[in-house]
Amino acid sequence: MRTKSRGPALALALATAGLALAAVPVHAAEASAPSTAASLQKSMDAMMRTGTAAGVQARLSEGDRQTVLRSGTATIDGKRPVPANGSFRMGSVTKVFTSVTVLQLVGEGRIGLDDPIGKYLPGLLPRENDITVRMILQHTAGIPDYTSMKEFPTSDEPYLKLRFTRFTDEGIVKTALTRPLDFEPGTKFSYSNTGYVVVGMLIKAVTGHSWQSEVTERVIKPLGLHDTSAPTYSTAIPGPHAHGYIKKNNGEYVDVTRLNPSIASSGGAMITTTADLTTFLNGLVTGKLLKPSLFAEMQKTVPIKIQPGDYGLGLVSMSTSCGRRVIGHNGGIPGYLTTAFTTLDGRTKLALSVNQKQSQSDMAAFSKMIDSAFCP
């Protein structure tokens, strides 16, 4: 899930105030290249100095070598370090998982990318014969984004009233469509979380099973992502995890680690770890999830314009400062910011989570962490 308060979605020195922790190799023989790890650690420490985050955890992969890095703490009281492979809410990185699921159904002949959405969900959307599945996956359908509406505040104090509310996909879409389409379908790009709620409904309409069930059977289980889940209403994060916060107008921090994920649905509800995200990225680029022709469809992009990069089918493609092309996604949900990117050859991968103190994070510092993993 992405909101305007988080800025564009993609997507500190070790001794500073005792906030940062040394890199933690996954195995002694698998330490990542020192220069890259040091560059990433420095940018993570810089993120901590912005004062908007309680902690950061990252997993940097270069070839068959991995390094886990941490900075800050699991809670704002500073008593516990960020878990080395703690669980976290991944926000809109969920969109990559749901898009992969749809593309698998395309490969099975059960969905056509250029079919009108009305073929599968008749009566749900206006212009149902003009809006295609591809447009929805690519945010070019013109569907209004519900997270920009007053009915769905997803940042800081206003969000507290909705924190434990149980939403339905149908209710979210119905409310979003009280606004007209933002533009003529297929003519522009505009990020729409509502569109990805529709994607979840599409998966259920075609398979007879919830998007959570299909993602679990098609992606999570085959890849052995034992610490990844797609909750429906459960408010808990299982296993060790850092805590996320929002900041009230009076300066008080509220722990929002426990929340009802239904507000994010198939566009942002999933939970994972950096280890599992790394495995997922590897599965994506090595053909374990999609046939080459379908992965190629996923990478057909349109310009995002509001930020560097282009958008495919649930996938961001962008160039780093040193010219390396990477693919992946950023994600935000109250309390957490996530990023997961890989080079196309899979040689370098980054999975990273920030447990926030407030929703207004320093996005320049966040972007620097991504860039430093690929351009030391």
Model-predicted regions and their roles:
Residues 1-31:
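Secretory targeting and sorting signals
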Residues 2-6, 28-69, 255-376:
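Catalytic loop of the DD-peptidase/beta-lactamase superfamily, centered on the K-T-G motif
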Residues 44-47, 54, 58-62, 68, ...:
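Primarily hydrophobic membrane-targeting regions of prokaryotic envelope proteins
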Residues 51-54, 77-135, 183-192, 265:
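Short active-site loop at a secondary-structure junction
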Residues 62-82:
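N-terminal, post-signal-peptide region of Sec/Tat-exported proteins
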Residues 63, 74, 141-142, 357:
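Solvent-exposed coil/turn segments that connect beta secondary-structure elements
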Residues 68, 128-326, 330:
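Short, surface-exposed loop or secondary-structure junction motifs
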